[in-house]
């Protein structure tokens, strides 16, 4: 390791730093301005970067002399300046203030802007070119932009890369939990979606890493500094249904805030989840360097999973009442200090109803299920975070991040079987407190050190009970009922220190050193097993590094990370359980080739995890009234070898893109499971299994046909997994195939019509020693929109055929329609909407898993007819 440090340090060469700050026309810091440095008469930039959220930038040049500095930013006039670089090692430029770009054209009106443009490392999408006018969130519009894909939880990917941050006006308001912004910010106030490639928020990290593997998004609002923008929306309708939404963003010099609120009974979950804190993960300019912190386990009532996991959108299946409020603020009193604070609270009540009918035959085991279930669940979520960034001095930064997270769930359900009625109650309360201190020290030409300390504490109260009517047992539930409780506490400490070497003759690299310690306390209680108190301690020490070599557009990366892991378990058992130490190494090799339009990746990595000594406890843990889990029989290592090929193409100006991937994972030491299934009151069996390998391939493409103003989007994926399933004395090899295909087409003529059609197909094929089980799911939709002056009419027709067998059709039809009337342009819009207008009360879904094929009947959300209005500030 010391030789690696020495080699990286000796190969460094001296650089001259050119620093500056960019302001907008009112004197506020201007983020993401493109800054380029040319030779005095040159045409190719010698150095380029973009200003950070505080307007600051740093460029590096190798020689003294006279240069030309150019600064560009959308909406501002080009800035040119002659720069004389001496041999002082560093040059501080005067503050640069840009002027707005206006063009006097008399009475001539310029219609529209280019929908997509590239500015250096930024790709800018005009929201108006992709919005239809009836979207409820900016995420709906972004999902139509070429290269962008938005998940249901609000997370975004660009050209296959996960977006790490989403900012508003250059300010990061919600951190990694930006999904609440994607799903709740009204698009009517957003002018541009700016995708920032090679994004790096650390000003010091930019000095040693000119390129980053991170991607971020900035939402540029329609109004400038000193304004409050956003919208207020409300609707009310049939069966007392309602939807209300507040979406506000305020910007002043040195202060920015956002207020998001939502209350609805139309199936929306405003905050799907809250991302884990970044902590010390991925602090090295995009290199994958993550040590996941374990989470405590919980118990899930069976009636709580049926219905909530139905393969249908939430607005189609949920009977809900949801309330959410989120507030975030960023305060920058001076250029060296920034405070970010945000809080999100949510309350949800849900109702689901479903039926379950199946037949299982394994060897000489055979049993049937015929059950009807209903459940109610209530949940509370609260999250608060604070981040402090301090530029201690020119070559050092300090960051503190801390937060508190809370989630409570309570469910009540009943299950009507052939023998009797089963009642279930589940309760869980999870809390987490976390603190991270991150220090960054730059040594200019000698590289950079970055690292710190992280601490997390988690607490979980998990209780479960089940009872039957009568005396005939249901699974594990007898006449005495079933109770289980697993209170847990988990405390984790982590430290990581990273050295990043500067670039020298195409070579660079890093070295890393750190450790992780956690302690988990578990108390098992209930009438199915005796009480056991256990405390598990684990330490993980690791060291390693990576070397990168760049030649032209090709980058070769080789890395190695070595671990030593030890676990010790103390439990209230007659015999003492010894501790154990394991050693493991994780090599990786990647070859990357990239240009402005093309990106290719070949990668190999070895990933290792360990089981937990808690699994060797002789008392099994209750999972539900149907089963218990005993886990692995020993503390051991699990290996996985991953091979990946990835290619993407993006022609932003023509709005065409393509991403394709081939992924193979082979587990030489796969994970074991060990469950005891109480299938019925007369039948039980022991099941254990392991996954040995998975092959996955995918293709996504966007194609724009300009002559017809039509966008074509297609996606396909295929996955094959190999398993070995052991049921009592039988060993069953399984092959699981999963195929998907999606296609959509959108054509529109501005201000007259907008038509979208699409379809998708999914199939699951499961093959074992017995018969092949096969199911299909298909859907198709047509989305029609027409404009008649101030009136906008939208109608969506959808056909779903979920989980069907050949020759057994099972279609459900849905009709949604909305009429909008713009009373005051850019201000007031009134609308009447109807959802689920053609649906029946239930639909049937055919499901297959490793051993069981089942027919599930789900209730569908009722018809919704509502009237409302939206006021834009």
Question: For each predicted feature, which ranges?
Answer:
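Short Pro-Gly-centered beta-turn/loop motif in secreted/extracellular proteins
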Residues: 28, 58-66
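Structural motif
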Residues: 19-30
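Membrane-proximal, glycine/serine-rich, low-complexity loop/turn segments characteristic
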Residues: 27, 54-56, 70, 76-79, ...
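Short, acidic Ser/Thr/Gly-rich low-complexity loop/linker segments typical of extracellular
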Residues: 41-56
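A short, solvent-exposed loop/turn motif at the edges and junctions
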Residues: 38-44, 66-81
